[in-house]
């Protein structure tokens, strides 16, 4: 009796579970889903993306220069199967709706936004953060091999992508240059007027994306959370979806942050093939974390009229004061600055941030000017400000043209140029502040912290990666021309950043750089520059070889023995190599605590990179592969690194360093003090 009774009591539960399973199966067949919040929802997440305890899908968590992705875990079929008569498969219509919110740490600064994505793959590991929104990088942006359709909600302007404003919506295919874009907003169904919306309002808003397979049109519509879907879409673009994705594709979201911390949220999401997306129940949505403004007190209500009267009586004085201040902070603007305009700082803000460019804020001297530490008053972001004198060797306009291009560079091992300001005869450049200063003080300063071998090897690999980006991975070739330890800065976590592009040159791929005056730092200049005056990738490699010697040996490029004579550091290392004691050249302050194989590899690679003949030096991609252990180091031979070649280098540079034949006698005479 007890077992039949148990079965009878379990029948409703079994029936309920069966119906639930049938419903889930039907949803999978129909290619549709609805998430009114994400608590317990199965999504594929990577990067900073998480589901909060409250059910919010948080793509970025307020950390700078990171990315996050969230995808529906299973691929969806975007094509109807071919007919039995042998016809080809046809693309399907789809529709999605979602609720999003962006919470920026500072009301006056923002990071890139977020994007809804339809992609062949969920793997965006090679994509960059910042303006690339975690979807592409500088090398593959716009390539047809990317295979993605995205709708971006973008809160910064990038001249590189032709962005129209810092508050726009765009339809992107395989890259971040939008096929169609418009300012964020909606068309009011009652009046027909266009109503602007702020993506940074910290209020949730709705977006609908509809693809019509018959017309190949992608329509994007948005509205405040409390309004229904407007009849007129915000923007439309014709997209040949069959050329973008294949039979199956993933749907989800991508987001990234730049130098300003922001949080990007998705509160709800629905999707359907061959029909309108299911409605979202906005009453069930999790709360978006926002800053709630305080209501004005009764005291303010009483005092406000009195204060207004006092303000009117003070206007005459204020006009005079403002006029004087404007003359003090007067800035120069020209038409060419449109390309870099969104990154322009006001002189007043920089003046205040640096305490009037006071001496106590002076960090040091960089190429073309002094560098000051600053703190932006509103955001409290720490910055470094370089004042470039109008007496620089280059014309001001030519120099700024270089800055406009270099300002587009984005790499984790490059010091980020945040923006600029022009005021009378000065150009002010604003960079990320690096709290641990320059690398050279850790290599040469007395009583400084001694860098471990692991830190040194990571720094060498990081700078090699940045040079690879400059030489090979950006749209133009960038020659740094001044790679050295004092131009490598360290952030709070001792990560390295190559900076000071005051001498850099850019040129298009397939062309040669023009002959210029020989510039750079003695000890790092490739010997051929003395004759040709033409910088090249090989001359940057030479300087990088000397830089690696600096980091590994803890010595300056040009040494002085006890007799007052000079000796090239590369000569000293070469002599150690010939004697089979190359690792004896490693910084003695490490007291033998280093990876012998890594140190030997680096020192031998230094000799190759510092070869006096440009054609004998490896390219930067080969250097990176060697440092990563992806390829074996070529065997070094006496013929490859001969005394005559080193003497040739010294003769070309016209210096007084001793030739290689005298190295052996001088090694023991080099003092250990720095």
Curated annotation (Swiss-Prot):
Inducing stimuli: Induced by salt stress.
One of the GO BP terms on file: negative regulation of response to salt stress
CDD domains assigned: lectin_legume_LecRK_Arcelin_ConA, STKc_IRAK
Enzyme kind, highest EC tier: transferase
InterPro entries linked to this entry: ConA-like_dom_sf, Kinase-like_dom_sf, L-type_Lectin-RKs, Lectin_legB_Mn/Ca_BS, Legume_lectin_dom, Prot_kinase_dom, Protein_kinase_ATP_BS, Ser/Thr_kinase_AS
Stretches that traverse the bilayer: 302-322
Oligomeric and partner information: Interacts with B'KAPPA.
Protein name: L-type lectin-domain containing receptor kinase SIT1
The organism of origin for this protein: Oryza sativa subsp. japonica
């Amino acid at each position: 009796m007890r077992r039949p009774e148990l079965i009878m009591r379990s029948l409703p539960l079994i029936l309920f579970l069966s119906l639930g399973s049938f419903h889930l199966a039907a949803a999978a067949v129909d290619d549709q889903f609805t998430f009114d919040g994400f608590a317990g929802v199965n999504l594929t997440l990577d990067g900073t993306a998480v589901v909060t305890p409250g059910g919010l899908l948080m793509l970025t968590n307020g950390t700078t220069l990171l990315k996050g992705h969230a995808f529906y875990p299973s691929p969806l079929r975007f094509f109807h199967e071919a007919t039995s008569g042998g016809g080809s498969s046809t693309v399907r219509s789809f529709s999605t709706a979602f609720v999003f919110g962006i919470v920026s740490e500072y009301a006056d600064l923002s990071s890139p936004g977020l994007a809804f994505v339809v992609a062949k793959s969920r793997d965006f590991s090679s994509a960059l953060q910042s303006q690339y929104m975690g979807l592409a990088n500088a090398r593959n942006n716009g390539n047809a091999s990317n295979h993605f359709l995205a709708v971006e909600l973008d809160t910064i302007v990038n001249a590189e992508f032709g962005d129209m404003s810092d508050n726009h919506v765009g339809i992107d295919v395989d890259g971040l240059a939008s096929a169609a874009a418009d300012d964020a907003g909606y068309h009011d169904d009652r009046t027909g007027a266009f109503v602007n919306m702020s993506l940074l309002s910290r209020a949730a808003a709705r977006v609908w994306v509809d693809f019509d397979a018959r017309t190949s049109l992608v329509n994007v519509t948005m509205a405040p959370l409390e309004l229904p879907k407007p009849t007129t879409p915000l923007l439309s673009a014709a997209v040949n979806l069959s050329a973008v994705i294949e039979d199956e594709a993933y749907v989800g979201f991508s987001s990234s942050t730049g130098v300003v911390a922001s949080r990007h949220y998705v509160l709800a999401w629905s999707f359907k093939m061959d029909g309108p997306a299911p409605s979202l129940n906005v009453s069930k949505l999790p709360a978006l974390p926002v800053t709630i403004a305080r209501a004005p007190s009764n005291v303010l209500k009483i005092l406000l009229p009195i204060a207004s009267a006092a303000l009117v009586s003070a206007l005459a004085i204020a006009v005079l004061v403002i006029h004087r201040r404007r003359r003090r902070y007067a800035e120069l603007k020209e038409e060419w600055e449109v390309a870099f305009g969104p990154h322009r700082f006001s002189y007043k803000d920089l003046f205040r941030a640096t305490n009037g460019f006071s001496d106590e804020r002076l960090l040091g001297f960089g190429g073309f000017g002094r560098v000051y530490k600053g703190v932006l008053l509103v955001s409290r972001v720490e910055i470094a400000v370089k004042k470039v004198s109008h007496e620089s060797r280059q014309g001001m306009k030519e120099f700024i043209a270089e800055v406009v291009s270099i300002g587009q560079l984005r790499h984790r091992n490059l010091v980020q140029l945040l923006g600029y300001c022009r005021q009378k005869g000065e150009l002010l450049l604003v960079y990320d502040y690096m709290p641990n200063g320059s690398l050279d003080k850790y290599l040469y300063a007395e009583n400084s912290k001694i860098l471990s071998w692991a830190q040194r090897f990571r720094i060498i690999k990081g700078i090699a990666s940045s040079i690879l980006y400059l030489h090979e991975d950006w749209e133009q070739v960038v020659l740094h021309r001044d790679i050295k330890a004092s131009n490598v800065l360290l952030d709070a976590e001792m990560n390295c950043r190559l900076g000071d592009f005051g001498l850099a040159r850019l040129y298009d791929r397939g062309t040669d750089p023009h002959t210029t005056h020989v510039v750079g730092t003695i000890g790092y200049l490739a010997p051929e520059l003395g004759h040709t005056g033409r910088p090249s990738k090989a001359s940057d490699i030479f300087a990088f070889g000397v830089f690696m010697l600096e980091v590994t040996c803890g010595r300056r490029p040009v040494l002085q023995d006890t007799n007052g004579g000079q000796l090239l550091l590369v000569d000293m290392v070469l002599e150690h190599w010939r004697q089979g004691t190359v690792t004896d050249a490693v910084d003695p302050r490490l007291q033998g605590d280093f990876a012998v194989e890594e140190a030997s590899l680096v020192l031998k690679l230094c000799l190759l990179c510092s070869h006096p003949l440009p054609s004998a030096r490896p390219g930067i991609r080969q250097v990176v592969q060697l440092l990563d252990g992806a390829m074996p180091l070529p065997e070094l031979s006496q013929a490859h690194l001969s005394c005559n070649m080193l003497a040739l280098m010294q003769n070309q540079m016209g210096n007084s360093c001793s030739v290689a034949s005298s190295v052996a006698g001088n090694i023991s005479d080099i003092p250990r003090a720095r």
